[in-house]
């Protein structure tokens, strides 16, 4: 495309330079990684979302995250994961390359808007089922999301749900003692907090925290900082047995074992009947199933925590079970060897430019 195929428009505090096919640009949100607007695609005749990555080459961390996000969005195709519709830059050469624009499906709201709204069991379990289907699809490619939270789960009025934002995803065959700050604190699994190695069911803890928030209407474990988050986990759910602490590094183990021991609250106290929908006789059984699923997701020791496959087979969500959704053909396994390399920033810029330019070629 030539420069005449693009136009510029200020959206909030950001200038978008987009293809002329996209009109009616309206600001809908922003974050550390980008600014998002809604628009109308005159070619496909549908409303879409356009995300402009903010300064993707300002440092190696931002560049790696942008590279991961683009590669993952290009390879993943599932109804419960946000779909990539277009990828472009107005730059004509690598020297001019500064901005990346990602065109995605447009949803109505993120899950933050849903929390606090009274939902019946059917809607709640259907949202949960879709979230688990999306996670299962990622896990089938060996991808752990690592950053699940209400703000990066989006929904439509018809109750359809999609996961977005993959910048923190990592393959499951790499067991890392990774930074405790990869996940928004409230949804961070215990094994992340204490620096243990972790695998796929780290995402299931996050789902449990989100599910709990949908039911209760408030954050289950609102830690003020890194240490307080661990303390909240043990105060609410109980101090884990000594076998758990044997897996920790000596310094972390020393701290954890020096803290008061807590019995924790019962699941019935944490999730009493009156926080669940209980309008019909059938609701009572669904409430029991919902509480049971929470108890299996929110296990401090990941060895005791339910897997995504087990969660999908649980009575609370299995009423929606569709093999075509649960066992959708997995993408090829994602190779993180590229984005784990430490290379000069200009080489990251080249890689990202190539990802953008090869999208429509």
Curated annotation (Swiss-Prot):
Annotated catalysed reactions: L-seryl-[protein] + ATP = O-phospho-L-seryl-[protein] + ADP + H(+); L-threonyl-[protein] + ATP = O-phospho-L-threonyl-[protein] + ADP + H(+)
PROSITE patterns named in the record: MAPK, PROTEIN_KINASE_DOM, PROTEIN_KINASE_ST
Cofactors (names): Mg(2+)
GO biological process, one term: JNK cascade
Keyword terms: ATP-binding, Kinase, Nucleotide-binding, Phosphoprotein, Serine/threonine-protein kinase, Transferase
Role summary: Responds to activation by environmental stress and pro-inflammatory cytokines by phosphorylating a number of transcription factors, and thus regulates transcriptional activity.
Record protein name field: Stress-activated protein kinase JNK
Organism phylogeny: Eukaryota, Metazoa, Porifera, Demospongiae, Heteroscleromorpha
Gene coding for it: JNK
């Amino acid at each position: 495309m030539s420069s005449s195929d693009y136009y510029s428009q200020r959206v909030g505090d950001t200038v978008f330079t987009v293809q002329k096919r996209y009109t009616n640009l309206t600001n809908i949100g922003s974050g550390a990684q980008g600014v998002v607007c809604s628009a109308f695609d005159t070619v496909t005749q549908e409303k879409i979302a356009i995300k402009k990555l903010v300064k993707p080459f300002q440092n190696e961390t931002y560049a790696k995250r942008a590279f991961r996000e683009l590669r993952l969005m290009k390879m993943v195709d599932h109804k419960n994961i946000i779909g990539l519709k277009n990828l472009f830059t107005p730059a004509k050469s690598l020297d001019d390359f500064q901005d990346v624009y990602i065109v995605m499906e447009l949803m109505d709201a993120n899950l933050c808007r849903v929390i606090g709204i009274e939902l019946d069991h059917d809607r709640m379990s259907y949202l949960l089922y879709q979230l688990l289907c999306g996670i299962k699809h990622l896990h089938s490619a060996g991808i752990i999301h690592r950053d699940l939270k209400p703000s990066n789960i989006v929904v439509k009025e018809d109750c359809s749900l999609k996961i977005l934002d993959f910048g923190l995803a990592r393959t499951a065959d790499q067991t890392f003692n990774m930074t405790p700050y990869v996940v928004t604190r409230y949804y961070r699994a215990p094994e992340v907090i204490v620096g243990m190695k972790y695998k796929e069911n780290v995402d299931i803890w996050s789902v449990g925290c989100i599910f709990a928030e949908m039911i209760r209407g408030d954050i289950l474990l609102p830690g003020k900082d890194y240490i307080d988050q661990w303390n909240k986990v043990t105060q609410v759910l109980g101090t884990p047995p000594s076998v758990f602490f044997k897996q920790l590094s000596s310094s972390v183990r020393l701290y954890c074992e020096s803290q008061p021991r807590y019995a924790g609250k019962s699941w019935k106290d944490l999730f009493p009947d009156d926080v669940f929908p209980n309008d019909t006789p059938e609701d009572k059984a669904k409430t029991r199933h919902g509480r049971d699923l929470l108890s299996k997701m929110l296990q401090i020791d990941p060895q005791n925590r339910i897997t995504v496959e087990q969660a999908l087979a649980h009575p609370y969500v299995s009423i929606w079970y569709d093999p075509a959704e649960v066992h959708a053909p997995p993408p090829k396994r994602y190779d993180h060897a590229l984005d784990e390399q430490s290379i000069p920033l200009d080489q990251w810029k080249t890689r990202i430019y190539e990802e953008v330019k090869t999208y429509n070629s």
